[in-house]
Amino acid sequence: MGSCPSSAGPGGCGTLVRGMASPDRVSQKDQARVRVSLEGTGESNISSGLPVLDHLLGLLARYGSLDLELQLAPDEPEAEVASAGRALGQALREPLSSDEVRGHGSAVAAADDALAHIVLEASGRPLVVSNVDLSEARTGGLGTDLVASFLHELAEGGGFTLHVRLIDGDDPQHVLEAIFKALGVALAQAGRPRKRRE
């Protein structure tokens, strides 16, 4: 990939997308390839092999105004979801831990009956604290327990402290959509330039 040019800005770079002024990060761990730009427009190109996960990551990108590309090698669903979370976290780890960005974000988002609150900090201490029971339900053929695995792998890969609170909602699909919308916004906030008083 070569060295990172000084023009890449505070987020650092994995590679630069041709024709884009903003830096992006690339991770190629666990046969997952992720490219993400924190200074995007919400465009996404996701091929995880799991339509529900594709949909949820598309919401994350759109609500966070992140440009996100993700390609996964075919595998068992459990491995695919874990790989996606870990690779995305690793791609975000360096830019969100930079002293030049806020490194933390908080957001509330709704999806029909569901309302979720996410607080994220690039603390270097991976931890997920959640009041959401994702142990048994299924949506679109995906066990929601795998989404819990995604969040844990995201936190581990990125070094994030992640608090997930479900304020309201019973429908599993809507609960997951609210969580991923709020997560996208919180990531966007974490990537904003740090103001002097912060």
Q: Predicted segment positions?
A:
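Polyanion-binding surfaces on beta-sheet-dominated domains and ring/shell assemblies
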Residues: 16-198
